């Protein structure tokens, strides 16, 4: 049974009912370099606008290892984070 990688993409906007989803499965070649990029939207009630965080992980698959071992290695790799946008403090409304 050959190794394969599955990927699922999702994109949604808070103000619309439109969602874009996609998925892909492929079989990488031995020693192929793969870069995984993820973008996560961070939301907090105190934030006036959402903040996005980008993480990137690069890896080279080694087929003699089991997929479980490879996934464990990926989860242990360090990720790089883009600087967070400055968050302005939100003043609470004055009580009436």
Curated annotation (Swiss-Prot):
Pfam families from the UniProt entry: Gemini_C4
InterPro entries: Gemini_C4
Highest taxon above the source species: Viruses
Subcellular location: Host cell membrane
Lipid-modified residues, N-myristoyl glycine kind: 2
Record's keyword terms, sorted: Host cell membrane, Host membrane, Host-virus interaction, Inhibition of host innate immune response by virus, Lipoprotein, Membrane, Myristate, Suppressor of RNA silencing, Viral immunoevasion
Topology in membrane: Lipid-anchor
A cellular component annotation (GO) from this entry: host cell plasma membrane
Keyword Magnesium among record annotations: no
Function: Pathogenicity determinant. May act as a suppressor of RNA-mediated gene silencing, also known as post-transcriptional gene silencing (PTGS), a mechanism of plant viral defense that limits the accumulation of viral RNAs.
Protein name listed in UniProt: Protein C4
Organism of this sequence: Tomato yellow leaf curl virus (strain Israel)
């Amino acid at each position: 049974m050959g190794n394969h990688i599955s990927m699922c993409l999702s994109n949604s906007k808070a103000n619309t009912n439109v969602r874009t989803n996609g998925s892909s499965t492929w079989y990488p070649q031995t020693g192929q370099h793969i870069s995984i990029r993820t973008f996560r939207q961070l939301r907090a009630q105190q934030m006036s606008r959402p903040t996005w965080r980008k993480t990137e992980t690069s890896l080279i698959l080694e087929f003699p290892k089991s997929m479980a071992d490879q996934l464990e290695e990926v989860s242990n790799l360090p990720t790089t984070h883009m600087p967070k946008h400055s968050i302005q403090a939100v003043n609470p409304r004055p009580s009436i």
